[in-house]
Amino acid sequence: MTDLLTLEAEVRTDLGKGASRRLRHANKVPAILYGENEEPISLTLEHKNVFRAQQEEAFYSQVLTLNIAGKPVECLIKDMQRHPFKQVVMHLDFLRIDAKHAVHANAPIHFLNEDEAAKTGANISHHMNEIAITCLPKDLPEFISIDLAGLELGQTIHLSDVTFPAGVTSDELAKGEDHDLAVVSANAPKAAKVSTDDEAAAPAEEAPAAE
């Protein structure tokens, strides 16, 4: 896993759309690194390495290391542009980080024991699949687990019900009680609806005979 979160990068000076197209034709990915009040740096990475790394969930939530001219730089992935129908990464945005400064990130949610919750006959509705968090880089979780084993019909788990790892806080909860958003709920199944065709097929009551 550590190897996948470390990528070799080269500084590029040939900029513009034409230069980016040439890079992609050479199986490379244009990128930019910014943040921490330093000048942005335009970079180039090998597509095969990026594509392999981005298949891992941790790529989107953990600290990455870019080796730039032999110097390691820690960062987070902030944006990734993909080709609309090809398996091609078009561009990457990296945010430079400092170990002493808190970062904002999105932690994916892993829902545990969902089958147990569904045994109640409930429809399990996911209201979010990731949670916006703030923490120091060393405290970044790869994911946040939510156990649904005790979730009963009609219940909802909110952000305030989630157990966050030490040093990690919810961005929404930090805004106040009005931002205690629903994360997942167990809803009663909708009653089966009789179709119009079924109603039409039902035998009509016989009208009383005229006297």
Swiss-Prot record:
SUPFAM superfamilies: Ribosomal protein L25-like. Residues 201-211 have a biased composition (Low complexity). Residues 188-211 are annotated as: Disordered. One of its GO terms (biological process) is translation. InterPro entries: Rbsml_bL25/Gln-tRNA_synth_N, Ribosomal_bL25/Gln-tRNA_synth, Ribosomal_bL25_b-dom, Ribosomal_bL25_C, Ribosomal_bL25_long, Ribosomal_bL25_short, Ribosomal_L25_dom, Ribosomal_uL5_bac-type. It comes from the Bacteria. Keywords: Ribonucleoprotein, Ribosomal protein, RNA-binding, rRNA-binding. Pfam families: Ribosomal_L25p, Ribosomal_TL5_C. One of its GO terms (molecular function) is structural constituent of ribosome. One of its GO terms (cellular component) is cytosolic large ribosomal subunit. Part of the 50S ribosomal subunit; part of the 5S rRNA/L5/L18/L25 subcomplex. Contacts the 5S rRNA. Binds to the 5S rRNA independently of L5 and L18. This is one of the proteins that binds to the 5S RNA in the ribosome where it forms part of the central protuberance. Belongs to the bacterial ribosomal protein bL25 family. CTC subfamily. This is Large ribosomal subunit protein bL25. It comes from Colwellia psychrerythraea (strain 34H / ATCC BAA-681) (Vibrio psychroerythus). The lineage of its organism: Bacteria, Pseudomonadati, Pseudomonadota, Gammaproteobacteria, Alteromonadales.
